[in-house]
Structures are given as C-alpha cells and as structure tokens.
Amino acid sequence: KRCEDCGFVYYLNPKASVAAFVMDRQSRILVCRRAFDPSKGMLDLPGGFTECGETVEEAVVRELSEEIGWKPKQMKYLCSFPNVYRYSGFDVHTMDLFFLCRSDEDMSDLKAHDDVAECFWLRKEEIEPEKFAFQSIRKAVDRLLKDDKYWVKD
C-alpha cells in the first residue's frame, strides 16, 4: 500500500498466530468453544496471536496457560496455513502455525479461561473439521485427522 502524499510503501505482511492440538494419553484432542466474536460459539483450538519479542513456541506456552491453565512440557511443529481474521471491521491477514502438544499427565482438571467459553475432549472419530471457526484451523484439523502417525491405535 502506497501513501499518495509522501510515497511511503507499507507492505501488508501477515501477523503470526499459533494454535495447539493438545492431545492426552488416550489420543483425544482438546477442543475449545469461542466465547467472543469473531465466530463466537464455534469450535476452535487453544491459541492466539504472538506478542512482540516472543517466539512462536513461547506464544504457544503463554496462550495455553491463559486459555486452559496448562503449560506444555513439549511441543512439535505440525504445519501452517494462511488465514483472514475479521476483527472490528478489518481483515487481519495471519499466518497460523500449528503445534502438537502431547501429555501423559492427568488433564481432567483443565478449565476454560480468558476468551474460551468451554473446552472438552474429542476422540478422532468425533472431530468434524467443518465445525471449526476458521479456514486455517479446518485445514490443520483435516491434515491431522488424515495422518495416522499421530494417533494411538486401539
């Protein structure tokens, strides 16, 4: 975008955001319901925008702590997808980075905090990508569901 008065060029680069597939020892995924717009009431993964000076890994830890009260001990990068996040009348272009955070600990006491209305566990066969709020998350969910290496066989 070029300023017609001074000629300054502003490049519209995407804002980095993170989301986590939190997987318990039964290979269930933690799913959240959005408490606020955009897409209030729709399904989501815990996550959010990175802050200035923060790595994406630090953002994952911070967002999980804020939204579900849990800090992962390990995480693995899975994939990324571009997205358009409509907020306050503006289209915010994002690059959403997805991580897998597995845990063998008891996670039955996780509760929704911050901008999460509720959180609950779903087994692989219960997950429906089309019920998630954003296209990038639907694509990441679909990719995870199709890759058997992430799922424990019964």
Language model segments and positions:
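Acidic, metal-coordinating catalytic segment for phosphate/diphosphate chemistry
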Residues: 1-20
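Conserved Nudix-box catalytic region and its N-terminal flanking loop in Nudix hydrolases
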Residues: 24-66
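A short coil-to-beta-strand element that immediately follows conserved catalytic motifs
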Residues: 70-80
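Charged phosphate-binding loop/patch that engages nucleotide di/tri-phosphates or the phosphate backbone
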Residues: 138-154
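A generic structural micro-feature
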Residues: 12-14, 42, 89-95, 111-116
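NUDIX/MutT-family hydrolases
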Residues: 110-140
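Active-site-adjacent beta-strand/loop module that shapes the phosphate/pyrophosphate-binding cleft
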Residues: 79-108
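Conserved hydrophobic "DFG−1" position in protein kinase catalytic cores
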Residues: 22-23, 31, 101, 121
